[in-house]
Regions:
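Aromatic pocket-lining residues of Rossmann-like dinucleotide-binding sites
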Residues: 19
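Extreme N-terminal starter segment of soluble prokaryotic enzymes
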Residues: 1-3
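N-terminal Rossmann-fold NAD(P) dinucleotide-binding loop
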Residues: 12-13
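A structured beta-alpha segment of the ubiquitous adenosine-cofactor-binding alpha/beta core
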Residues: 49-70, 76-107
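Rossmann-like NAD(P)(H) cofactor-binding subdomain of soluble oxidoreductases
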Residues: 85-153
């Protein structure tokens, strides 16, 4: 099983390293316009293989993506001084206009996993260009709120002193400021949050909800302030999504993909619970939310929709 990664910067290289640490697949190919960077990252990661799992890590070009089951796209340009967000998006849209057809030329059956930010909009753009060469949107997936969901579960687990693997909770909508933490659906080992807290005699109140909400929503800002970029968390999230696809696990993940019409949300790309397998998205589910969460989710979708409309694809 073979994975391609286009863009070997912090996120792409860390994703490759995470694949090695998890033992996902057999081969990873790094593609970057800076071939020397890709080769150096491949060599460095290959040297970690003896301490982890027997994967082959190489650098190559688009032609070397042939046979890939999944291609992660983390390529993009940085923001220039004085450049607006929309101008940056426009330039990254042009990058994707070149990257996506080139990837699909050599790996026409691959599932595309988009990790370039803002991931909702960039996934929508990728699906647009993939559609032009006949690839369905179900095979174009964004990392979405997978990392946000992990942060949410981890913080709840720490507050309750419970292994976060037993916490079921989702962050939906935009991967960004308008994302929605679905507190009404939180369960611990299948037990509703409030019922679990009552049984354990744990006091949890609105202040706790607000503190966790703030930490999830501001996590990336906090990390970037201290070290300039985030990559370990998202790299690990990417590796997990790739694992689900390669193993056809049929797992529920909060990835993003263009919406046809789910809970009244359509013609936009945001994160909802998706059943993911070897061919990409199998089905998108309508979460059962309270009135406030439903309203917030629609508002979040509108934030993304407005940006997409400005791009005039």
């Amino acid at each position: 099983m073979k994975t391609g990664i286009v863009g070997s910067g912090f996120v792409g290289a860390t994703a490759a390293y995470a694949l090695v640490m998890r033992g996902v697949g057999r081969r990873v190919v790094l593609v970057d316009q800076n071939r020397a960077r890709a080769e150096s990252e491949a060599d460095d990661i290959q040297h970690a293989v003896p301490f982890a799992h027997p994967l082959e890590i190489t650098a190559g070009d688009y032609a070397d993506l042939a046979g890939c089951n999944v291609v992660v796209v983390s390529a993009g340009v940085g923001q220039k001084p004085g450049e607006t967000r929309l101008e940056l998006l426009g330039r990254n849209a042009q990058v994707f206009k070149q990257v996506i057809p080139n990837v699909l030329k050599y790996a026409p059956r691959a599932v595309l996993l988009i990790a370039t930010n803002p991931v909702d909009v960039m996934t929508h753009i990728a699906a647009h260009y993939a559609d032009e060469v006949g690839v369905p949107s179900s095979r174009v997936i964004g990392s979405g709120t997978t990392l946000d969901t992990a942060r949410f579960r981890s913080l709840i687990g720490r507050r309750l002193m419970v292994d976060s693997q037993h916490i079921h909770a989702y962050v939906l909508g935009e991967h960004g400021d308008s994302e929605v933490l679905t507190w009404s659906q939180v369960t611990v080992g299948g037990i509703p949050l409030t019922e679990f807290c009552t049984g354990r005699e744990i006091s949890i109140c609105e202040d706790d909800y607000a503190a966790i909400d703030e930490k999830v929503r501001r996590a990336a800002y906090h990390i970037i302030e201290g070290k300039g970029a985030t990559y370990y968390g998202i790299g690990s999230a990417i590796a997990r999504i790739v694992e689900v696809i390669l193993q056809d696990e049929r797992s529920l993940l909060t990835v993003c993909s263009p919406m046809k019409d789910v809970v009244g949300i359509k013609d936009v790309t945001v994160s909802l619970p998706n059943l993911v397998g070897g061919e990409g998205i199998i089905q998108t589910f309508s979460p059962i939310l309270n009135e406030g969460e439903t309203s917030a989710l629609h508002a979040s979708a509108q934030v993304v929709r407005s940006v997409i409309a400005e791009l005039k694809l």
